[in-house]
């Protein structure tokens, strides 16, 4: 944003003053704005040393490093201000949840482990951050983060690694922080945003979250509708299936109601419905040239929607009565494919149109858009400090910088949106 930054300097100062209002001291507000400008300026690396050089703050490099790494400001307070600001503009219809990897060469940074990340497409040495985004059709913003702590970093876990647990002190990891599954971190972030007064009624996530029944149940307990990805191995009964009570033989405990047929994999249920059940749906127009109404490429495929009863021990344990609850199964089955290629579960109402199911499921593209923008220009993985606090400070300010870019696009757009 190099040359453009001077033109919007006043806007940036006003935005920084609003978002950094929770800072207790004037010097924190000053360094917050300086760091924000460093992230927004053109440059290959967005770590302290090169940013200080580009900003002409070489003599204050240590002060900038202290601000981001160890200064005692609460990142959650900044994120809450950011969330309020962006909610007014985005008018979110959906919360989107995902995680991204921060690749690392060494093992000294907080929570670095060998783990799978989609960033690299393999198991590698990295940190993993779970993020929560406000989204509408026209814009989105990341408003909350959690750094995932693997079991190897948790001294209370049987999988604890003594070398890693010894690093907790130097990394400043709070004693009360232990291993928490990513899906639970996502629910915790939803609870936190609600405590800020932000309540969005619909959640979207990929199969890394949707495959976990406890996550789906957690969304339902919070009164949230959802459309979440699932794997082909997820099992379910058909909507018409009914449990029955086997005859009692007169000895032992009475038998409990059970479904006469075993649950089937969702892929088999869709294949059984047949290709003729697939309907064409266009969910949006992309940014590349094409045949859409605006001259852009149409995002289009064929989809099957079935009413089914998701199965599994966790679902049964949390169901009142003998019948499993009915949910939507959505599957994408392109005309060029022999089998369906992607699957989602949803608790949206039974009369929800197919187009609404598809548009909601596909809204997850916004989180990929946010990640791509941040990684290309704002350096979320460029933080070279090793502390727990510093990581949360850095990704929070990257989110602030990304939100400022989004606001500038909305301001300049004739339609008042930031669509990409």
What are these regions (language model features)?
Residues 2-204, 208-235, 242, 250, ...:
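Conserved, well-structured functional cores that handle cations and Mg-NTP chemistry
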Residues 13, 137-171, 175-178, 231, ...:
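An anionic, glycine-rich sequence signature occurring as long contiguous blocks
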Residues 33-34, 49, 342, 355, ...:
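Non-catalytic, well-ordered alpha-helical scaffold segments
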Residues 107, 371-378:
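Active-site-adjacent bridging/hinge elements
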Residues 111-116, 217-219, 223-226, 376-397:
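Compositionally biased, low-complexity linear motifs
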Residues 346, 354-361, 376-393, 412-415:
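Short, solvent-exposed helix-loop connector elements
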Residues 368, 400:
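Hydrophobic, well-ordered secondary-structure elements that form the walls
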Residues 402-420:
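Conserved nucleotidyltransferase catalytic core and NTase-mimicking acidic/glycine-rich helix/loop elements
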